[in-house]
Amino acid sequence: MSIPGNSRRRGSRLLTTNQLVFSSHPSSRLIIGEGCAPSLLQFALLDESRVTMRCRLAHLLTAAMEGVVLLLVPCAVWPFGSVHAYFQWLLIVGVGLLLVLWAARTLVEGRLVWVSCPIALGLATLCLLVIVQVIPLSAGAVGILAPGTASLRGALLPAAPEPVGGGSLTTSSVPAATLSLDAGATRDGLLQLVAVVALFAAVRNNLRYPAFFYRLAWVCAANGVALALVGMGQLASSPSNVVFWSVPTRGAVFGPFICRNHFAYYANLCLGLTAGLLLGTRYFQGLATEVRRPDREPQLAWREMFRDPRVLWLAACLAIVGAGLVASLSRGGILGLIAGGGTAVVMLMARRATLRWAMLAGTVSLSLLLACWFGFDRVSHRWQNIWHDNVAAESRVAVWQRTLPLTARFAVWGSGLGTFERVEQLTRVPGDSWNVLHDHAHSDFLELWIEGGTIQLLIALVIIGLVVHRGARAFSRHASNSMGFLALGGLAGFIAVVVQSFVDFGLHIPAVAVLTAVVAASLANLAETPPTDALPATPEPRPQGWGFPVALLQAALLAAVALFLVSTAHRAEQAERFRLASRAVTADRRVDYLKAAVALAPERVELRLSLVDALLRRADASASRSRAIMPLTLGPTPSVPGLAAVLALTNGIPGPVFQDGTDLREAKTQALIARQLSPLQFDAQEVCLRLGVESDGPERALDRLLLLSPSMPEPWLQAGRLALGRGDRSKAYVCWRNALRANEGLLAEIGRAVPHEISPRELLDQVLPPNPAMIFDVVAKGAVQGLSSEDERRFCRAALALLAEKGEKRIAEDFLLEARIHTRLDDVDAAINAYRAALAKKPRAPAWRLELCQLLYRTGNYAEARRELILLRSEAPANSQVNDLYHQVLRAEQQ
C-alpha cells in the first residue's frame, strides 16, 4: 500500500524522499518507491518482521480487552448486580485490567490511541464537576459558590470550638468544608462514576470494530435468557423477597436483583440487542431499504426462515426475556420497552412502509402466553395501580413533589453526589413517614438535579442526546447490512433505559451501568465505521502520527487511573470487611476492627459512628458491668435514646453517666469529626448531644435535630419539655403538637404534664392537633388522668365538631368514631344512627355490628338487637361472644 507524499511515519521511524512504505497488516505486500537505495531496501526488509510482531501483539491486546468486557458484562449481574463492596471491587479490577491493556497497546503501537468523542468529553466533565464537589474549600469560598450549602452548613454546625477532654476541637482539627454536604458519600459515587467513564473510554477507543458489538449482542441474549428463567423460576417457587431461594431481603426480588425494576433495565437492553440480531438475519435484508433480494421468492424465504435454527433460537430468546420482563411487574420497564420499541418501529417505517409483522407478532404472542402462565392477574392488578405505587410508605409522585424544591436550594453545584438520602429528610414535615429512609429519589434525573445541580443535569441530557444521535446515525449508515439492525436494537434498549430512569434508579446499579456504558460506546463506534457486511475478528493497528513520548504519557496516565481505581476500591472493600467482622468479636476487638476500618476509609461517617458506639460500650462496661448503654441508632428509629441528656436537663432524670477516660475522649473526637464530615447525618448530631460536647447548649442542638428530620417525634417531645422548663410555653405547645402529629403514641407521655404543668383546656386548645380520634382518645383511653366530667364532655364535643366539618366526605370510620363519642355522651339515639351509617358504608364489619348490638341490649332495644344478632351470627357463626349475647337477648325478651 503506497502512501503519497514526501514524509510518512513507519512504526516509530520517520523516512523521507522516495521511501519504502508497507502496510502494517502481515498479509500486505511490500511496495518499493522509485530510486530507493539498496541499503534502504535491506533496512525495510529487516524491520518488516518487527512491525508484523507489533501488529500481532496489538491484535492480542485488543482481543484480550474484548474478552475482559465480554466477561464483565454477564458476570457483573449475578452477584446481586454487584452492589456490595466486594463485588464492586472485583468489577473495578476488571476495569483496571482494561486500562492496563489499553496502556500496553498504546506502547506497542507507539502512538496516541484516542478517538475524539464529545460523549467522552461530556462524561469527563461530569467527573470533573464531582471532583470539584469534594475539594476542601474555605467557608467564604463555599458561601460564594453555593450559598444554599453554606447556609445549611452554618445552621448545622456550631461556630464556637467544642471541648474535648479539657481542651477543644478547633476547626483546624477537622476536615475543611466542601461543596458536598457529605464528602465521603460523594467520593464513593465519584469512584463508581470514574470506573464507568473509564470503561466507556476503553470500549470507545479500542473495540471499534463491528464484530465486538455482534458478539456482545449474543452474550447479552444468552445472559438475558438465563436471568429471565431464574427470575420466573423464583417467582413460581420462592417467596418474593428471597434471592436465589436462600437469601432473604427487604425488596421485591427478580433473579439476582434485589429490586425487580433493576432487572427491567438489563432486560430491555438484552431485548433490544436480541431483536437486532434477529432482524439482522438474511431473511430481513429488505426491511430497512427498498432493495429486495432477487434470488429469493417470498414463500421460499419464509419457509427457510422457519427452518433456520438461529432464527428460532433468537425468537425463543426474545419470547423468554419478554415474558420475564412482564412477569417482573416493572411498570417503568414496560413503559421503557414501549418507548424504545416504538422509536425503533418509527425509524423502520420511515425507511420502508412494508414490514414483516408476522414474526414480531408471533414473538409478542409467545411472550404474552408465558406471562399468562406466570399469572396475568398479578400483572393486570399491578398496572391498575400505575399511579398509586408506593415507594416504601409514600408514592413516587409524593416524593418528587416534596423534594423538587431542593433543586432551587442547590441550584448550581448541587448538594453532592450520594447525598439525596440525607437532604430528602429536610423536606419532611411533622406527620410524614419518619421511620423510612429514601436512599434514592426513584428518578435518576431528579436525583442528579438535586445532587449535581443544573449544570450536571444539562450535561447528562446532552450526553443522552449525543448517544441517541450516534445510534440513529449508525442505523442509517449500516441500514443495508445486519449491523444496522443491531444498532437499531441497541438504540431501542438505550432509549428504554433512559425512559425508565425517569421513574426508577437502576443506573445506580453497577451491572446496569456497565452494560449501558458498553452499548453506548458501541453505538458511537458503529456510527463511524464504514458500512460492510464483513465481521472482522480484530482491527488493524495503523502506526501514525504523534510519536512515542505522547504514547508513553497516555500509558502512564491510564496506569495511574487504573491504580487509583483498584486501590481505592480495595480500601473501601477492606473497610467494609472490617466493619462486618466487628459484629462477631469481643468489645476490645470490635474497637480495633473499627479503628482499622476508619483508617482505611476515614471519610465514611457510618464507620466513625460505629466506632463511637463501640468506644462508649467499652467505656461503660469498664465502669460498671451492671449498667448497659443504650445503643446508637443508625437512621431514624422508633426512639432516640441519645436524648437522655436533655431529659436530665429538663426533669432531673439521671441519664447515662460516663467516667472520663481515653475511650470517652476518643469517642467525643470521633463524633465531632463525623459531624464535621457530614452535618446532614442525624446520628452524628444526636451523639454529639448525647456526649455533651455541644458548645452552644442542648436547645440549639435540638433545633439542629429538628431541622435535619422534622418528621421525627422524639426531638419535638424533648424540645417541648426543654422549652416548658425554661418558661417558653408557646414554643412548648408547638413542639408537642408536632410531636403528636408525628406519633400519636406520645399522647400518654404528654398527658402526664396535665394538670401539673398545663391545664386540660390548654391541652385541648394549644397542644392537640385537629384530630378527632386523638382528642377522643384523651377521654376513652385515659391518656390524661384526673379529668373532670365537664372536661371529658368538652373533649367529646370538640371531636364531634371536627367530624361535622368533614360533611359528606366522612368515611365509615368517621361514623364509627361519632357513634362511640355519642355513646360516651349517653346520646343513645345519635349513637345508634351513627352506627347504622357506618355499617351502611361498610356492611361486612362484624366488630362494629357487635358494638351496635351491645348498645341496643344495654338500652333495652331487644328486638332490634335480636335482628342484628341474627345477621351477625350468619356472618360469624362460631363467635362465642356473639352467641352469648344472642342468648342474653332472648332471655331478656322472654322476661
Give the residues covered by each predicted segment:
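Alpha-helical transmembrane segments of multi-pass inner-membrane proteins
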Residues: R10, F43-L45, S49-S82, W89-A103, ...
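TM-adjacent membrane-interface loops and short helices in multi-pass inner/ER membrane proteins
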Residues: Q133, V203, C259, V397-H438, ...
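Internal, charge-rich low-complexity segments
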Residues: A139-A160, L271-P294, V612-L643
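Extracytosolic (periplasmic/ER-lumenal) interhelical loops and adjacent juxtamembrane/interface segments
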Residues: G140-S180, L406, G418, R422-L426
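Hydrophobic alpha-helical transmembrane segments in integral membrane proteins
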Residues: G375-V391, P543-D588
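Soluble catalytic regions of membrane-associated enzymes that act on cell-envelope
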Residues: T427, W434, S567-Q785, E790-R793, ...
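Terminal, low-structured helical/coil segments at or just beyond the last alpha-helical repeat
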Residues: L763-G782, K809, R866-Q895
